[in-house]
Amino acid sequence: MKYTSYILAFQLCIVLGSLGCYCQDPYVREAENLKKYFNAGDPDVADNGTLFLDILRNWKEESDRKIMQSQIVSFYFKLFKNFKDDQRIQKSVETIKEDINVKFFNSNKKKRDDFEKLTNYSVTDSNVQRKAVHELIQVMAELSPAAKIGKRKRSQMFRGRRASQ
């Protein structure tokens, strides 16, 4: 009886161990492929610290982290765009972009498309510059948390008056 339990436990360990190998996120395998392609496993890559990891560790609040993550995701999209025609890493790039879509954009295609549109604007294009400056005051107002709170208080105040009338 005891031996049967040990055998079943051993088989369970083997099954769970093998599932760990096969259930690994596809992006990990593809990221390893990109590491080989870019020689990112070489020791000199660690010189002068990390690009992104220290920055992410510095920010604990979710909203702050999202800001930093959006810049990092933007960087990766630009990096991948530079190598979109390289057939040797095409599958890896597409797999990782799809995983970013799921993790960062919650599979929301509209959110991803708008994000990519923002990252593709050229700051050297005079028409883009003119439009950006034209919209600057409204964008700054949207950035201000005080403006949002004031709007919310006014709308709650009006709702309260309507309910009491």
Curated annotation (Swiss-Prot):
Tissue and organ expression note: Released primarily from activated T lymphocytes.
Glycosylation sites recorded in the entry for this protein: N48, N120
Alphabetic keyword roster: Antiviral defense, Cytokine, Glycoprotein, Growth regulation, Pyrrolidone carboxylic acid, Secreted, Signal
Subcellular location: Secreted
Location of Pyrrolidone carboxylic acid modifications: Q24
Known function: Type II interferon produced by immune cells such as T-cells and NK cells that plays crucial roles in antimicrobial, antiviral, and antitumor responses by activating effector immune cells and enhancing antigen presentation. Primarily signals through the JAK-STAT pathway after interaction with its receptor IFNGR1 to affect gene regulation. Upon IFNG binding, IFNGR1 intracellular domain opens out to allow association of downstream signaling components JAK2, JAK1 and STAT1, leading to STAT1 activation, nuclear translocation and transcription of IFNG-regulated genes.
The name this protein goes by in its record: Interferon gamma
Source organism: Macaca thibetana (Pere David's macaque)
